[in-house]
């Protein structure tokens, strides 16, 4: 009872961080292209233009601000830039200003310099600090850009040059020193490329195995095959998306956008028609990636719902629920992805569509979030049932360590199936592309996200006893067939025992029993007649060997499998006709998990 009361509270506590950082999870695989950077820069320019228009339409506010700004003159002393430490001589206006009075100057008007939207500037050499814009991917978003406003209400110029002075050194530090950052990204790319490749290969083999053996065709394995296929399509869509995005100019290339290039881009934007045509392939790739990403989450949820139904439903019709699970896993993600595509194409048809566009991202993120929360709650509840079952089976025994080991093993087996690793760093959103915590988080997520399909294929296919039994049986049949073919190529043989000569082909030396397969002579018992060995392919009428073979009843054939109890899928697709079948179904699930 104590465990039952604690589990809901624990699930609620662990699910709260999931709701608080959904954006970080779903956008983890996005990349920034040069075209997307251009789009963000133009959008920032448009927003700045609106703000400038609002400010310029209120001259009274500027004059009121003008009255409040005063600064003391420091004639005869050079000024030092607070940001860069460079010394600049005083202007002639500052030298002429009286030293025994306070001078009221005009503020510098806000303006767009093709990178930043500068606010009103205080006069008399005051340095204006503005945070580095977050819409420029390569900038250091913790730094600041600096400008200085003179007493005439003009932004200070660079000495000897006819352009406004600005200090972007803190913002562009990632552009000038990116060797270590590139090593981190290259390592992350290698990790998830290897992981998704191994997952794709192992899942392909697993699907072929489950599809080839007819005795493995059952609802449980059909659901496994759908889950495997969703992992495979997710991996393929990621590879395709990366190929499309990286085929053009991206911000992960060696040549990055410099400050001058950003200004040139903002001054001469590309034609909208050309930009839209160039985004077609990218948008299709991103759309399929988001769809297969969503289907993967929902088939993980289907696995949890299926196992949960076997545990808590007394009468569970698997055939009927399989169709519902199929529609749920493939159809529901198609609905909200189609809605998202329609909204993006209608209201925000800009960029490559892998960027968030206001609140429209929640059309996809909320359903994915809901699936993560649900299958984590199912995981907690199933682990609770496992703990209860182990406690009941271990009642009266003193070895509690074995009980805990079984529970730990069962939990570890269920973790990759339910994607429990998703919630480890859910409370840590992507706020910066640097730092030790960010590197730990990215390595963890890239490792487990890419290798999750590989772990699922190993646990639920290659380590499954039923699958191993079918493979061993097929291997035995294949080696037996090779043995007969090898002996058949040796031709007919003559065997002489006393007055009788038997010319027998080796392909007919054994009777067909059991599963209808021919048996090798060395596998059959050798009978004797009058002290002479009796060949399997020849026996005198009335001999014990012949009588034994002739009177062998059909009941000696392989017994019919009875479903989960014997580790087979036969009989799983029948409707539940009595209270005995659900425990049989559940027994196989316990064998897989335990």
UniProtKB/Swiss-Prot annotation:
Mod. after translation: N-glycosylated.
Disulfides per UniProt: 48-117, 108-149, 132-171
Topological domain ranges for the Cytoplasmic compartment: 210-223, 317-319, 383-405, 462-594
Glycosylation sites: 152, 162, 167, 177
Pfam families: 7tm_2, HRM
Transmembrane portions of the chain: 189-209, 224-244, 296-316, 320-340, 362-382, 406-426, 441-461
Signal sequence bounds: 1-28
Residue intervals annotated with topology Extracellular: 29-188, 245-295, 341-361, 427-440
GO cellular component, one term: plasma membrane
Positions of region (Disordered): 66-102, 525-594
GO BP terms, alphabetized: adenylate cyclase-activating G protein-coupled receptor signaling pathway; adenylate cyclase-modulating G protein-coupled receptor signaling pathway; cell surface receptor signaling pathway; intracellular calcium ion homeostasis
GO molecular function: G protein-coupled peptide receptor activity; parathyroid hormone receptor activity; peptide hormone binding; protein homodimerization activity
Keyword Transmembrane: yes
Subunit-structure text: Homodimer in the absence of bound ligand. Peptide hormone binding leads to dissociation of the homodimer.
Name of protein: Parathyroid hormone/parathyroid hormone-related peptide receptor
Protein's gene: PTH1R
């Amino acid at each position: 009872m104590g465990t039952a009361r604690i589990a809901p509270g624990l699930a609620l506590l662990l699910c709260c961080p999931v709701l608080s950082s959904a954006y970080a999870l779903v956008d983890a695989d996005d990349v920034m292209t040069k075209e997307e950077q251009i789009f963000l820069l133009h959008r920032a320019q448009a927003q700045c233009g609106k703000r400038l228009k609002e400010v310029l339409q209120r001259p009274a506010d500027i004059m009121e601000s003008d009255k409040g700004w005063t600064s003391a003159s420091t004639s005869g002393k050079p000024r030092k830039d607070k940001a860069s430490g460079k010394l600049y001589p005083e202007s002639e206006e500052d030298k002429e200003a009286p030293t025994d009075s306070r001078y009221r100057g005009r503020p510098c008007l806000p303006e767009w310099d093709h990178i930043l939207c500068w606010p009103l500037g205080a006069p008399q050499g005051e340095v204006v600090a503005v945070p580095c814009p977050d819409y420029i991917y390569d900038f250091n978003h913790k730094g600041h850009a600096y400008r200085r406003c003179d007493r005439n209400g003009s932004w200070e110029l660079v000495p000897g040059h006819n352009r406004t002075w600005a200090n972007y050194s803190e913002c562009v530090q990632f552009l000038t020193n990116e060797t270590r950052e590139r090593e981190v990204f290259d390592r992350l790319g290698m990790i998830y490329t290897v992981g998704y490749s191994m997952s794709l290969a192992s899942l392909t083999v697993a699907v072929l195995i489950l599809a080839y053996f007819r005795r493995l065709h059952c609802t449980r394995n059909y659901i496994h095959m759908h889950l495997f296929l969703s992992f495979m399509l997710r991996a393929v869509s990621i590879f395709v998306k990366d190929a499309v995005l990286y085929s053009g100019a991206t911000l992960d290339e060696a040549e990055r956008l410099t400050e001058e290039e950003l200004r040139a881009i903002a001054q001469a934007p590309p034609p909208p028609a050309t930009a839209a045509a160039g985004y077609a392939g990218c948008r299709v790739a991103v759309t399929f990636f988001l769809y297969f990403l969503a289907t993967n989450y929902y088939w993980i949820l289907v696995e949890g719902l299926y196992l949960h139904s076997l545990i808590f439903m007394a009468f569970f019709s698997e055939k009927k629920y399989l169709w519902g699970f199929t529609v749920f896993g493939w159809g529901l993600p198609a609905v909200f992805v189609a809605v998202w595509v329609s909204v993006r194409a209608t209201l925000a048809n800009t960029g490559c569509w892998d960027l968030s566009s206001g609140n429209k991202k929640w059309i996809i993120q909320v359903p994915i979030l809901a699936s993560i929360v649900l299958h984590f709650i199912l995981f907690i509840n199933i682990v609770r049932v496992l703990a209860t079952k182990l406690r009941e089976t271990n009642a009266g025994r003193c070895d509690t360590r074995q009980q805990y080991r079984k529970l730990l093993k069962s939990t570890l087996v269920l973790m990759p199936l339910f994607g429990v690793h998703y919630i480890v760093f859910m409370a840590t959103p992507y706020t910066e592309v640097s730092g030790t915590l960010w590197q730990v988080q990215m390595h963890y997520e890239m490792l487990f996200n890419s290798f999750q399909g590989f772990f699922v294929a190993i646990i639920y296919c290659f380590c499954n006893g039923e699958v191993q039994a079918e493979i061993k049986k097929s291997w035995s049949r294949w080696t037996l067939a090779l043995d007969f073919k090898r002996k058949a190529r040796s031709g007919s043989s003559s065997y002489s025992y006393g007055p009788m000569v038997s010319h027998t082909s080796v392909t007919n030396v054994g009777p067909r029993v059991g599963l209808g397969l021919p048996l090798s002579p060395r596998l059959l018992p050798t009978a004797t007649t009058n002290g002479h060995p009796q060949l399997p392919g020849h026996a005198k009428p009335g001999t014990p060997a012949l009588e034994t073979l002739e009177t062998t009843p059909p009941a000696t054939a392989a017994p019919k499998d009875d479903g989960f109890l014997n580790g087979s899928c036969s009989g799983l697709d029948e409707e539940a006709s009595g209270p005995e079948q659900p425990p049989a179904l559940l027994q196989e699930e316990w064998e897989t998990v335990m």
